[in-house]
């Protein structure tokens, strides 16, 4: 623990542009909340498909399902969650607005989706559009799946439902096409006459589309014009889904989390540095190799511009030129072990330092910083080999942001990450990027990463026997 004299020495001996130690009040180093129960299960990939009535949502869902034949996939329709029409409303059912958000039992929809995300089977009601009741027996049994497609006109309306989705698709179609499809569908499938369909369209469907459905288009990640006729868009969506299904569950939740592709070589190096019997020399050697891979991967996320050069043969090569304004910031002291790899990759790079030190049991922290004066103009590679609770990372990132560094300009590099720390950092800072080589099982009761690799700084710098 740093004494007052230590603080004064550091502050007075440093004649540069940093402010020494900062007293941070009320910053508890408590363990973050445990991951939600559903994250302990294999996380399904949830796709929301919204759009106006008869825009082609069902066709798009069917085509996605057909191309996901090798995956467990299921479609959940918002139509299944209509409220029952009571006896009073049934007398004037033609004046009942089925396109209003209040027509749906959103709470039941949320309950069913939460159970599916937790790996539990659910019974979903079957809604009868002739009796306007959801008591058709038997209910539809939906089992847990790798992919859940949630389809409906208003699934983007409630933010709680939107937050369940990993991908949001809006199916767009011309108004006249949607009207023609609706007339055909409602007369054939729902037993309605054309006059009733047109009356309902002008009274409820069209106003609801303009008031409630169209405004949710802004939440979509992907907009598909022409619906099921757009085969190129659907093929690209399916490719993206296959990519996500091959990733760690946390990568499906947080698009700003990147885990380098695992190979036998990488797993072999992890085996060596995790082994408590590995010598200091071998630990440093293989740690440096892994760190170099993480650094190289992190550099690949920097912005670039196209550049043409002339080769010794006189030919023109079209390549790229990465941004010049770059610096590293290591979290003392374990983060300093990553500096050599960064210098080897980026000759002459400036490297700053941050020390986050807990003082006593009151949760207060001392922060020491030594950063480039123009850090607000640079892309920052934040270095810390282990992401555990996420407390230190959060404080380091907040400090960088307070210095004017845009959140999107920070790339956090580490060797291993605990899910608890990933959740904390990604939720608080959704625009930073985290690059790691492996996701751990979690934290134990002593807040240590498991299976982990012990106290990294002590093992790397040879102070574990002191």
From Swiss-Prot:
Q: Per the UniProt record, which EC number(s) apply here? A: 2.7.1.48, 2.4.2.9
**Highest taxon above the source species:** Eukaryota
Catalyzed chemical reaction(s): UMP + diphosphate = 5-phospho-alpha-D-ribose 1-diphosphate + uracil; cytidine + ATP = CMP + ADP + H(+); uridine + ATP = UMP + ADP + H(+)
InterPro entries (alphabetical) = P-loop_NTPase, PRibTrfase_dom, PRK/URK, PRTase-like, Uridine_kinase-like
> Which positions bind uracil?
454-456
Alphabetized, the UniProt keywords read: Allosteric enzyme, Glycosyltransferase, GTP-binding, Kinase, Multifunctional enzyme, Nucleotide-binding, Transferase
Cofactor: how bound: Binds 1 Mg(2+) ion per subunit. The magnesium is bound as Mg-PRPP.
Q: What happens when the gene is disrupted?
A: No visible phenotype. No decrease in uracil phosphoribosyltransferase activity.
Using the UniProt record, name the top-level EC class of this enzyme in a single word: transferase
Q: Where does 5-phospho-alpha-D-ribose 1-diphosphate bind?
A: 333, 358, 384, 389-392, 455
Chain sites annotated for binding GTP = 280, 289, 323-326, 378
Obligatory cofactor(s):
Mg(2+)
The pathway entry for this protein reads as: Pyrimidine metabolism; UMP biosynthesis via salvage pathway; UMP from uracil: step 1/1; Pyrimidine metabolism; CTP biosynthesis via salvage pathway; CTP from cytidine: step 1/3; Pyrimidine metabolism; UMP biosynthesis via salvage pathway; UMP from uridine: step 1/1
In this chain, the stretch annotated as Uracil phosphoribosyltransferase covers: 256-466
Q: How is its activity regulated?
A: Allosterically activated by GTP.
* Record-level Gene Ontology MF annotations: ATP binding; cytidine kinase activity; GTP binding; uracil phosphoribosyltransferase activity; uridine kinase activity
Residue numbers spanned by region Uridine kinase: 41-246
* UniProt GO BP: cellular response to hypoxia; CTP salvage; UMP salvage
UniProt family annotation: In the N-terminal section; belongs to the uridine kinase family.
Chain's role: Involved in the pyrimidine salvage pathway. The uracil phosphoribosyltransferase (UPRT) activity, that catalyzes the conversion of uracil and 5-phospho-alpha-D-ribose 1-diphosphate (PRPP) to UMP and diphosphate, is unsure.
Name the chain's protein: Uridine kinase-like protein 3
Traced from the root, the source organism's taxonomic lineage reads:
Eukaryota, Viridiplantae, Streptophyta, Embryophyta, Tracheophyta
What is this protein's gene name? UKL3
